[in-house]
Amino acid sequence: MLVAILPVWGCTWAGCGRGTEERIIPARVWATGPSYRVNSLELARAETSIFARGDGTIRLTSAVNEKIGFNLVISAVDSAVSGVELRADDLAGTEGKISASAIRAYRPYPITVERYPNWFLRTQGLREPRAYPDALVPIPVNGVGASPGSIAAQPLVVLAGQSLALYVEIVIPPEARPGRYKTAISLVGPNCTPLRTPIEVLVRDVYLDSKVSIPVVAGVQLGPVIASFTDIDPQNKSVAISKPECRKAIEKTFALLSEHGLSPYCDEIYPRFSQDVDGNTVLDWSEYDAFCGPFIEGGGNAEGRGAFAWPLPVGMSQPHPSQFDGMDSAAYMLVLQDYLSKARAHFEEKGWLERAVVYFDYPSVIDPNESELQRVRRLIEWVHDAGIELPYMSKLIPQPMTPFGWTAYHYVDLTRVVDIWATPARYQDAATLAELQRLGKRTWLLPDRPPYCGSLAVEAPPTHARSIAWQAYLQGHEAIWLPRATDWPGKVLDEAISQDDQASDAWLVYPGKLFGCDGPVPSARLKLLQAGIQDYQCLRLLSEHGHAATAGLLARSLIKACGTGAYGDNFQDAHWDRRIDDPDVWDLAAAILREEAELAVSEHPAEPISLEKNRADWLRFLAATRSLEVWVGSARLRKDPRPGQTGYLATIDAEVRSELRTSVEGRLKFGPLAEGASAIDDDKQIGPLEEMSVASRSLTARFPEAPLCDLDGHYIQSIVFDAGRSGLVEAQATFSISRVSEVSKPPRIDGSLDDWPPGTQNVMGDFRLIAFTHGSARRRAESQTIGYCCTDGSKLYLGIQALSPAGPTVSNVESNIVTYEDLRPVGSDLVEIMIDPTGVATQSDDIYHVVVKSTGNPIFERGVSVSPPIGSVAPWPGPRPEYSVTRGADGWTAEIAMSLECFGPRESRNLVWGFNLARLEPVRGEYSDWARAQRYCYDPASFGNLIWPDGGVGE
C-alpha cells in the first residue's frame, strides 16, 4: 500500500512553477468539521458547518483549555498542486494573543478495510475495499512539528481533480482569555503567492477542567509497540522493558494516550512469583515497580496525572490455576489469597491502593454456563475473604436476559459481590444501571458495536468515536473502559484488514516509525474520542449548574437509544436508526453545547449572545434529530371470513413513533385504495403520543380479488398519519403476493428450471436489501433472486434462480451448518425459505425453515437454529423434501419439492400462507428478501402472502 501512495506523499515535482515569476497556487482551500470524512475525489463544497466560500473564512467555537480540530481541505481543481507547505499566523484577539505554535497539522495515511461486520453491511454499505484516512502523521506548520528528513516533513502534493484533507488542531491554552481570535493558515511554495485562508475562533468563557472529565481507562498492549520500534522479541517482555529504546517507545505511547485525555494502564507485567519451602508466596517487585510505578504515579504524561485505575497484578496468568490443581482446588484458593494479600500490601506501601482494581478475565465468553458462573462467585468470595477490600470488576451481564428473548442465558445474581460492572454496551440495561448506581456500585462503559454503542472500528462513521463519551454521560457511568488501545496488527500500515475475525477497534494509535517518527502517531478516532471527552466536560458543567435538562436534550437527540434500549423484538434484533451519524449535526450540537455552557456558568460571555440565533440553532438541531415516523411491520392477506362475503381482507400493522418534544395526536388511515377496494377498519385515533413513544395500530381493507401485483409479486398501498400542526407522514406498505399455480405434470427435481411453466402470478422477485430504511425505499440487491411456486395437489414445488454478478467469488464449503450473526446468516451463498402454513404464527418456533446453499447441503427444520437461540428448534416433520442444485456461470438454480403432509392436517392449513424468500450473497454481503421484512426474516408477521387455489391446499 505504501508504494501506491508514496507519489502523493513525496515532493517529486518542481513546485508551483518554474522560473522567477510568482504563480498562483492552483487550488481551492475549504474546511469541514472534524467528523466529516472527505473523499479524495470530492471537490470544494460551497458551504459546510464551519466554512462559507462567500468570505472564505473558517469559523470555530471553543472553550478555554480545549483542543479543537477540523479538516483543512486542499482541492486541486485544474492542475496538480505540489511543493507546498503550511504557514500559520499567531491567533490575535482583543484580550491577548495565542502563539501560532498552538496550531498543529496532520496528514492522514489510509488504512484499507476489506471485511465488514454485519452492523456495517446493514447501515453503511456493502463489502468492497475502502481506504479510511485514519493514521494521522504530524506535518510541519511554520517549519516545525515533524522530524527533519522524515516522509511527514516533505512538501504536500495533490493530484489534479483530487482533494487532500489535512487534520488541523488548535490548542487553546488554559491561560487564554475568552474572546474572538483571528489567524490564518496559508499554503506557501517556491515562486508562489501564498494562498491564505482566514480563521476565526470564538473562545467562550467556559473552562474545561479535567476534574469534571470522564476517565477513559485504556489498556496498552506491549507486544505491538516492542515489535514496531525495536528488534527485541516481543514475547520476552521482561527483557524488552529493560532496554532503553523499548522503554522510550512505551513511554511515548503512554504519553500520547494521556495527551488525548485517556488514562492508560498495562496488565501484562507481573512481579516475579515464587514460593518458599513452606509454600508461602514470595513476590519480587523490583522489575514491576521500575516499569509500572512511573505510569501509575503519573510520570507517563506531561500533567503528572496519575492513573485513574490500575489492575492489581493478579489474574488467570499469575498465579496460574493449572499449577495448583485447577480453579476449584483448595490449594489454588490458599495460594491466591496469600498472593492477593501480599499484592495489596505492596500497593498500599507504594501509595497506589486507591487506584487498584481486581479483575480476572474469566469467563472469557459472554454466555457462561452454570458451573463457570458458580466458579466466578467462588472466586469473588475468595478475593473478599482475603480481606484485601479492593473493588472487583466483572464484564458479566448483571440482569436476567429472559425478558429480552435470551431464554437460554444462565443468570446468577452477583450484584452484591461485584463492585465494578463493565458489561459490554450491548447488554447494558438502563433500569439495571440505575439500580446498580443506586446501590453504590460503579459502572463503566465498555464499548462494543452499533447500534447499542458507538464503534471505535476504523470503518465506523467518524461520529461514533465522539459519541462514546456522550453515551457514558447519558448512562451515568463513572468511566469508559477500552481494554485494547494499542493492539494493532503486525502489518497494519501495509496490508488490508481482510479477515472476518480481524478486529479493527483494538488500537487508537499507529506505529510512527514508517513515517520517520520515533513514537506512535494518533488515529483520527483518537482525536474524535478526545473531542467527545471535551463535550462530556461541557455536559457535566451544564448539569452541575442546574441545566441537566438542556444537557439531556442534546444527548438524547443524538443518541435516542443505547444498550438494551436499542433492542427490537429481542436481544438479537436491533433498531438501527436510533443514532445520529450526520457530522454536520454533531458540529451544530457541539456549538450549541458550548454556548449553553457559557450561558450557564459565565456572568461575562466572550461576546453578547444572540438569543434569536440561539433559538434558530436549536430549531435547526431539533429538526435534524427529531422526527415523526410511520413504520410498516406487516402487510398480510386473508380470505374474508364474514358470512356471505368473498374476496380478501388486507391488514396493515403499523407503528407511529414520535420523537417530537410536544405531545402528538392524529389519525392513521389508508391512502387512496384501488378501485373496488373499501376500508372496513380504518381511521384510527392515535395519541396523545409523548416524546420518544410508539403506538401500534392495524388498518384493514376489503379487496374483491387479491390485489393486482407487479410482475415481481408486489402491491404498494399507502397509509397516512395526519397529526395536524405536527405534520402529515405517509408510508408505503408492500403486500408481497404470489399465487401457487396448479400443474398437472410436476417439474423434475434436477436443479434445472427448463421444464417449469411460464411464470405468471407465481413469481417472487425484486429482492431488496434488508436494512433500516423503509420498505419501498430500500435498495435493490445487485445479485437478484427469483422464486417460482406450483403444486400438483400433493406437493409444494419451489424453483429458485439465484443470480450472481461477474467478479470475485467466495469459497463455499460443502456443509449444512449455517452461522448466524444479528439474525442473518453469514459466509455462504444461500437462499432461505420461511413458511407459515397457518397464516397466524407469531414466533420463530412456529415456522418451517429451509436453507439451500449454492453447494447443495440444505437444512430443513422447524424453527430457526440461530445461536444464541431466539426460540425452540425441532426436526422437519414428515418426509424429507427432495432437492437439487445446479451451478452455472451467472449464478445457480435450485428446485425443492415438499410434501404437503409435512405442514399439518389439511384443515389447519390456511388458503393464504405466510411466506418469504431471503438471499445471502457473500461476495458483497448482500442480504435481501422478497417480502420486504423490516429488520430480520424470522418474524412471521413480516412474511409475504402465498395464495393457494380456491379449492384448498392439497386438493
What kind of feature is each model-predicted range?
Residues 706-955:
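Structural preference for beta-rich elements and adjacent junctions enriched in aromatics
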Residues 72, 179-189, 715-721:
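A short beta-strand micro-motif common to beta-rich folds, especially ectodomain repeats
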Residues 313-399, 405-406, 492-659:
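Catalytic domains of carbohydrate-active enzymes that cleave complex glycans
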Residues 415, 420-502:
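Catalytic-core region of carbohydrate-active enzymes that cleave or remodel glycosidic bonds
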Residues 73-74, 166-174, 697-709, 898-902:
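Short, hydrophobic beta-strand segments
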